[in-house]
Amino acid sequence: MSAKAYYHLPGLFEFCEFYRAFLPLYRANRDWFYDWCEIGSIYGAPADCLWGGGRAGFGECGAREALALAQEYGVSARLTFSNSLLREEHLSDRKCNALCELFSQANGVQNGVIVHSELLTNYLRTRYPALYLVSSTTKVLTDFEDFRRELDREEFRYVVPDFRLNKRFEELNALSQVHKDKVEFLCNECCWFGCNDRKRCYEVVSRKNLGEDCEHRCKAPDAQSGYRFSKAMENPGFIGVDAVLRTYLPMGFSQFKIEGRGLGSALILEFLLYYMTKPAYQLRVREEIYLDNMLDLF
């Protein structure tokens, strides 16, 4: 059984101001939060990053500012560089290389990169060996044997499978502890469980980050409603807080990713309340972050 769950949180650049409010609260009032979980990392990418993927980045926070905040609270900072369509000429991008250089020279906790492209994986291993690598969920690893082979790869510290493997308990439990330690489950995906277009959706984001003009219309039922946490909770691949504590930790798994870079900070707070905060203190966290006696909704 794993002793602790480590959550990997969205929005290093996108929600820098939110974390500037939340992290001091988390440190000063640790008893408000479950003692069986910690923040494993915060991930994201600035706007207009050529190597970006997964979501089109919109983070406006400065790189040094975002990194300094993570370092102040002893949290690993991850760059989301999961563009799947990179070519050799893209490796010389000055902005992305400068970010890797900055993050690789950081003191204290080690920082990492979430990556898809094999070309970029090899480049980062050679050029920035101080950064650990995470195999991105944008690879859409839905075949368990493909996932197992990805876990075998020594270049990756963690591997994020497609959310549709989350409940394959017999095969998951049969993994060695070395492999279990590398699995990072995506907990709160809202994507239609039967989607056959997921990889193409991610490729469209990669093309947009490369400056290409392309459109993609989601074909999932209820796609027009967008992300709703209540809908994600009904997804067959959803991993709830009780499942983390009573199923996955006892099985020996410890790494859990929360998605949400393209959402609003109010929803990010709801994720952290649900996954990390004791029910008796959830209202107090809201009051400390935004809720006062003069706040009007309408």
Task: State where each predicted segment sits.
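Active-site pocket-lining/capping segments in soluble small-molecule metabolic enzymes
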Residues: 1-150, 156-298
